[in-house]
């Protein structure tokens, strides 16, 4: 079959989000053809180029979300009126929907229908006129948004929006709705695929929704991170009006995608709960765990005895959400009971905030653990080391996990813990905080403690450091669990089955091929019966009965006219 793979800031770009699993999916399903429709996020991402594409990728079409030239489309009076009506309806839903995730079901359904009608109305207008880039950037759009914010019934945060807030929201909506103006939805584009697979939420689902609306192509939505949750986590400093209105848009778009999709997949139960909260039908939901290549970790997983029994390892991106401060304080408690224990922090900072956090952690480690020397002529050595993968000591991620007997995860916010799965594939016992999908991933093969609790973290680490046999049992069980649930093979097989399920239930009805010739078996044969099943004729109903039973009934008495006085 032919799959339309829809991505935002992802595959096939080298620095794309979720690039790795999309690349593995395309390579693993070589029996299918893929048409990739990619939305880029920046000029630098486009300049970095694409990853090598396999032969089953037939074509790639791209469009930028970070830049859009004015389409120079001048709307006529009737088109301007239609745009104003649709955009006003969209804005009214957002201003009334902000913060109403707990609204009654009937009200929520009504608002969802209003959002869908406005969205598809804008899409149809863009298709007829050639684009809405100029209209969405216009002063009229900002004024329409302002009227919706000031209208009776608008949420408090929307009513408090000021001019800078309105401009920020209008600019975001213009960028988010740019897929409406693309020419991807004709019969030679997404209309020619058998299935659209959106690799994330947000803008990536819009082409899939429009392909379904215009041509009836079924839609599959995959989310390893729910976009609404990401919005809440990444915009804590935004003005309340901006944060509320953008959250309303993300929530409404997600709800419409879940409603129209044939199947919605989540990477873990944590993301699945968010999807249900945003309106996804539980019958449509599937959990497909991310697939990871187990081969690089095979050597470490098959030789756990090579690890240093007195070394703890932390691996990940250095940022405040990882809570390395609590880990360092927990390590101070561990050193009181196990003075020879060492901690290796392996990871690179993420952005300026991560770099500043790394400097803070280095300073805290130097304060908690002054360099210790075994003798007057031996240089001091700090029990905490900060390293990065790619150096001479740790050239590969597997080398980092192989260096220690216990792997620690100290996060306060976590989605799907990739580093935890890598530690499990390496056959290492783990101590983790109870956040995100940690419990779902770890099962009963590791120790789990509350977040922001250095004492509990220290006690769990000490318990494993003191018991080599327990470490070995947990490590072996963790590796077996990871090989069963989190490999590339299971991920590819799961999506292959979902593809077949969707196409069997919702096939695209095409009766002509590309050359205009009839397609064999495009329409199933239909049986024609010579009578109605629901209302059998009397002769059929009494075929085995007496002949007189089929005659018309005879009146007992003839009709007698009423006398003149009775009329």
Label each region the model flagged.
Residues 435-448:
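Short acidic/histidine- and often glycine-rich active-site loop of Leloir-type glycosyltransferases
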Residues 301-335, 342-349:
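Conserved donor-binding/catalytic core segment of Leloir-type glycosyltransferases
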Residues 358-392:
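Nucleotide-activated donor-binding/catalytic signature segment of Leloir-type glycosyltransferases, i.e.
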Residues 146-179, 244-299, 306:
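Donor nucleotide-sugar binding/catalytic pocket of nucleotide-sugar-dependent glycosyltransferases
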Residues 412:
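Aromatic "clamp/platform" in nucleotide-sugar-dependent glycosyltransferases that forms part
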Residues 456, 470-485, 491-501, 511-514:
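A short, well-ordered alpha-helix in the C-terminal region of glycosyltransferases
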Residues 447-454, 463-469:
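Conserved acidic donor-binding segment of nucleotide-sugar-dependent glycosyltransferases
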Residues 429-432:
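Short hydrophobic beta-strand element within catalytic cores of glycosyltransferases
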């Amino acid at each position: 079959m032919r799959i339309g793979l829809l991505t935002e800031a992802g595959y096939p770009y080298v620095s794309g989000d979720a690039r790795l699993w999309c690349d593995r999916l395309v390579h693993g399903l070589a029996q299918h053809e893929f048409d990739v429709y990619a939305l880029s996020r920046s000029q630098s991402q486009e300049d970095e180029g694409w990853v090598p594409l396999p032969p089953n990728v037939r074509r790639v079409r791209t469009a930028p979300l970070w830049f859009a030239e004015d389409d120079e489309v001048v709307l006529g009076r009737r088109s301007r009126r239609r745009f104003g009506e649709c955009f006003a309806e969209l804005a009214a839903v957002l201003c009334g929907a902000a913060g109403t995730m707990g609204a009654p079901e009937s009200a929520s359904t009504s608002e969802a229908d209003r959002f869908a009608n406005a969205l598809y109305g804008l899409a149809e207008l863009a298709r007829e006129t050639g684009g809405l880039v100029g209209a969405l950037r216009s002063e009229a759009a900002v004024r329409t948004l302002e009227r919706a914010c000031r209208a009776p019934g608008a949420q408090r945060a929307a009513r408090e929006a000021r001019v800078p807030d309105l401009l920020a929201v209008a600019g975001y909506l213009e960028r988010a709705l740019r897929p409406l103006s693309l020419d991807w939805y004709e019969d030679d584009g997404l209309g020619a695929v058998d299935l659209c697979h959106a690799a994330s939420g947000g803008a990536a689902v819009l082409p899939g929704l429009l392909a379904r609306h215009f041509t009836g192509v079924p839609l599959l939505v995959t989310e390893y991170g729910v976009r609404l949750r990401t919005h809440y986590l990444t915009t804590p400093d935004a003005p309340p009006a901006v944060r509320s209105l953008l959250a309303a848009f993300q929530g409404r778009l997600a709800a419409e995608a879940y409603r129209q999709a044939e199947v919605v997949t989540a990477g873990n139960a944590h993301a699945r709960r968010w999807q249900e909260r945003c309106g996804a039908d539980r019958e449509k939901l599937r959990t497909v765990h991310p697939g990871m290549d187990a081969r690089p970790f095979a050597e470490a997983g098959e030789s756990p005895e090579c690890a240093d029994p007195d070394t703890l390892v932390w691996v990940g991106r250095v940022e405040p959400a990882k809570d390395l401060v609590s880990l360092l304080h927990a390590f101070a408690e561990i050193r009181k009971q196990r003075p020879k224990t060492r901690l290796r922090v392996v990871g690179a900072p993420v952005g300026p905030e991560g770099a500043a956090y790394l400097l803070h952690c280095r300073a805290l480690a130097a304060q908690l653990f002054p360099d210790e020397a075994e003798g007057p002529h031996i240089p001091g050595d700090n029990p905490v080391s900060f390293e990065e993968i790619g150096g001479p000591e740790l050239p590969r991620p597997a080398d980092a996990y192989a260096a220690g007997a216990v792997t620690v995860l100290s996060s306060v916010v976590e989605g799907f813990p990739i580093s935890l799965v890598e530690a499990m594939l390496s056959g290492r016992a783990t101590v983790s905080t109870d956040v995100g999908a940690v419990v779902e991933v770890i099962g009963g093969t590791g120790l789990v403690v509350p977040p922001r609790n250095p004492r509990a973290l220290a006690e769990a680490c000490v318990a494993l450091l003191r018991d080599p046999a327990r470490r070995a049992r947990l490590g072996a069980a963790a590796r077996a669990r990871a090989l069963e649930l989190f490999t590339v093979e299971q991920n590819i097989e799961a999506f292959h089955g979902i593809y077949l399920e969707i196409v069997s239930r919702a096939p695209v009805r095409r009766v002509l091929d590309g050359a205009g010739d009839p397609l064999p078996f495009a329409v199933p044969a239909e049986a024609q019966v010579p009578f109605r099943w629901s209302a059998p004729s009397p002769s059929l109903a009494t075929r085995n009965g007496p002949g007189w039973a089929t005659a018309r009934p005879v009146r007992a008495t003839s009709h007698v006219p009423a006398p003149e006085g009775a009329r």
